[in-house]
């Protein structure tokens, strides 16, 4: 009888222990997905998503040509660089920038590292990637070489237009509800490791792959998720049909409207000049969104309206007569 009682006591203790273990297994949570891990790693480190774009004017670069704390990197083609470039500029292909920063220079030796291109847009995109990589002293030169001298200004002179001003709308388009984010599959667990994989991937892709033409957007606005990143008063003046306002400085944060962006549709993003947008395209593409920059921004389709309202419109006034090395 005593043996029987002992058996039942042992049985119930075993069942209770097993039950407790099962309960512990059931509450064990899965690790966060790569998107969440990367986003948590980046937010707070990337200042330009709050509207603080590191864009500097050409005259600041000109004034600091003899300043060894300023390092100029020209990412234009070899032929354009040979035709004329800023004194002491290094000609580095865009796809080699990350390696250049990691192995060829000590970025901390410089107060400012300035990226220069044709229009300021591709330089802004790669400056964005480098800022995301942790290099907080990198800047892009506003308007690119178009603002340095007239024979480099065709990029902007040929692309500032008013073609679609009559097709703008003023209706306020509502954002969708928050959805699920893109899925990243780098195979890494830590935010820094995931970021490194994303940067390696994106530096290998030419910036041209992210350029969208405003004419194509106006012809088929339904084919894109159109984001006008700016201020309410500017949005109300007129925007691309179907465009939704994402407020400058706040709308692309995790706790606001970031997750209203679609994971399965092309995001066509634009700002006033396309240079600010290029920074945002870099950030969103790192996170896995399929994002393109409407080239030259609002200057490509409403340049006169920008001028009338005192906004950031390109004109010959932005072109200087600064010296180059030929």
Please state what every model-predicted region is.
Residues 1-22:
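Bacterial Sec-dependent N-terminal signal peptides
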Residues 20-55, 82-112, 123-209, 235-266, ...:
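Rhodanese-like catalytic fold shared by cysteine-dependent sulfurtransferases
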Residues 22-32, 68-81, 223-234:
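Short, compositionally biased "basic patch" segments
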Residues 53-59, 65, 78:
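Extended, small/polar residue-biased N-terminal targeting/export presequences
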Residues 60-68, 216-220:
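A short acidic-Thr-Gly-centered motif at the start of a beta-strand
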Residues 61, 71-76, 89-92, 224-229, ...:
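Short hydrophobic beta-strand that contains or immediately precedes a catalytic carboxylate
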Residues 71, 112-114, 225, 266:
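Structural motif
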Residues 116, 270:
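Short, surface-exposed ligand- or partner-binding patches at beta-edge/loop junctions that are enriched
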């Amino acid at each position: 009888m005593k043996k029987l009682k002992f058996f039942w006591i042992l049985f119930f203790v075993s069942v209770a222990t097993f039950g407790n273990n099962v309960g512990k297994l059931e509450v064990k949570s899965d690790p966060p997905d790569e998107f969440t891990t990367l986003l948590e790693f980046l937010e707070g480190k990337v200042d330009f998503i709050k509207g603080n774009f590191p864009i500097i004017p050409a005259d600041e670069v000109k004034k600091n040509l003899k300043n060894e704390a300023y390092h100029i990197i020209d990412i234009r083609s070899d032929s354009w660089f040979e035709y004329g470039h800023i004194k002491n500029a290094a000609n580095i292909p865009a796809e080699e920038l990350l390696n250049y920063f990691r192995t060829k220079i000590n970025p901390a030796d410089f107060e400012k590292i300035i990226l220069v291109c044709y229009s300021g847009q591709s330089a802004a995109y790669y400056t964005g990637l480098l800022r995301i990589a942790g290099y907080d002293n990198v800047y892009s030169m506003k308007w690119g070489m178009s603002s340095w001298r007239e024979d480099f200004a065709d990029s902007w002179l040929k692309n500032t237009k008013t073609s679609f001003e009559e097709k703008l709308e003023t209706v306020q388009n509502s954002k969708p509800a928050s959805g699920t984010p893109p899925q990243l599959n780098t195979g890494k667990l830590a935010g820094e490791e995931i970021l490194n994989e994303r940067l390696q991937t994106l530096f290998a892709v030419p910036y041209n792959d992210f350029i969208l033409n405003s004419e194509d957007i106006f012809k088929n606005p339904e084919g894109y998720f159109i984001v006008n990143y700016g201020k309410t008063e500017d949005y109300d003046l007129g925007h691309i049909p179907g465009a939704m306002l994402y407020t400058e400085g706040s709308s692309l944060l995790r706790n606001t409207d970031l997750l209203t962006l679609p994971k399965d549709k092309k995001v066509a993003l634009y700002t006033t000049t396309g240079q600010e947008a290029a920074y945002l395209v870099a950030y969103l593409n790192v996170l896995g969104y399929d994002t393109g920059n409407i080239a030259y921004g609002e200057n490509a389709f409403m340049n006169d309206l920008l001028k009338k309202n005192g906004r950031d419109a390109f004109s010959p006034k932005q072109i200087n007569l600064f010296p180059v090395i030929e």
